């Protein structure tokens, strides 16, 4: 009996929605409508008002791509999705294309300030047994 093979279709990714709204609907909403569905931390930050630096970043992102910023505390709004932003990590600027899933998160969440530590092998004299290893 011959084995029947079926070709598996690649898993289709569903369209991202935030509280039932897709990204086009979020972009079309007014700020008051967005405030109603924002998480409380982002809502309080928006209600307090953006700083001058954050307003400048927002204006530059609206003009076009390729913005460099130190404002890690800027809230990602729906109008920023898909834009390229260089976010300062404390050492260098990290280029980030803002994903759809990043709406209402902070810029700083996408530019990490610490690297993951990768430990190497122990050096000579680090352990008692390694003292007698011949040097090359």
From Swiss-Prot:
Q: What keywords are annotated for this sequence in UniProt?
A: Ribonucleoprotein, Ribosomal protein, RNA-binding, rRNA-binding
Q: Name one GO cellular component term.
A: cytosolic small ribosomal subunit
One Pfam family, short name please?
Ribosomal_S19
Instruction: Look up and give the organism this protein is from.
Output: Methanocorpusculum labreanum (strain ATCC 43576 / DSM 4855 / Z)
A single Gene Ontology MF term assigned here is: structural constituent of ribosome
**Which gene holds the coding sequence for this protein?**
rps19
Function as written in the Swiss-Prot or TrEMBL entry:
Protein S19 forms a complex with S13 that binds strongly to the 16S ribosomal RNA.
Q: Which family does it belong to?
A: Belongs to the universal ribosomal protein uS19 family.
Q: Which PANTHER family does the record match to this protein?
A: RIBOSOMAL PROTEIN S19P FAMILY MEMBER (PTHR11880), SMALL RIBOSOMAL SUBUNIT PROTEIN US19 (PTHR11880:SF2)
Q: What's the protein here called?
A: Small ribosomal subunit protein uS19
Q: Which domain of life is it from?
A: Archaea
- Whether Ribosomal protein counts among this entry's keywords is yes
Question: What biological process terms from GO does the record include?
Answer: ribosomal small subunit assembly; translation
